[in-house]
Swiss-Prot record:
Pfam family, one: Ribosomal_S6
Positions of the UniProt region annotated as Disordered: 94-155
GO molecular function, one term: small ribosomal subunit rRNA binding
Annotated keywords: Ribonucleoprotein, Ribosomal protein, RNA-binding, rRNA-binding
Domain of life: Bacteria
Similarity section: Belongs to the bacterial ribosomal protein bS6 family.
Source organism of this protein record: Rhizobium leguminosarum bv. trifolii (strain WSM2304)
GO cellular component, one term: cytosolic small ribosomal subunit
GO biological process: translation
HAMAP family referenced in this protein's UniProt entry, alphabetically: Ribosomal_bS6
Name the UniProt record assigns to this protein: Small ribosomal subunit protein bS6
Gene: rpsF
Entry-linked InterPro entries: Ribosomal_bS6 (IPR000529), Ribosomal_bS6_sf (IPR035980), Ribosomal_S6_plastid/chlpt (IPR020814), Transl_elong_EF1B/ribsomal_bS6 (IPR014717)
Role description: Binds together with bS18 to 16S ribosomal RNA.
Amino acid sequence: MALYEHVFLARQDISAQQVDALVEQYKGVIEANGGKVGRIENWGLKSLTYRIKKNRKAHYALMDIDAPAAAVQEMERQMRISEDVLRYMTIAVEKHEEGPSAMMQKRDRDDRPREGGRGPREGGFGDRDRGPRPPREGGFGDREDRPRRPREDRV
């Protein structure tokens, strides 16, 4: 049997419980065809880079699969039929990653407070008015210093 990583996107208007039900449904398809599903990750609702079938967001889910090719083909066939699945991608891998995926590690990183984030700054000019601007080069400081241009309708 071959090893696969499978990611699919589900519509934004279904609930997280319905996404879990989809994962269980496709897990059942794999197991019915002689395969095993290892790690399952639900990455949650994320914004899409571009609209897919009129959706701006989607629920992302990842499954590590150890199954024959026929089982994966059957799962993909059922995903093509389902209206709840926007996109899917299956990749053959040499071995499954241990621990959380890169997306889950990124989520853990994003949960921590950042040191260099935008916040109130000490010192500098961000906390007070900088005062009047210095005169511009050429002798004109503000709009009142400019010579009036003749208007064509006054002639």
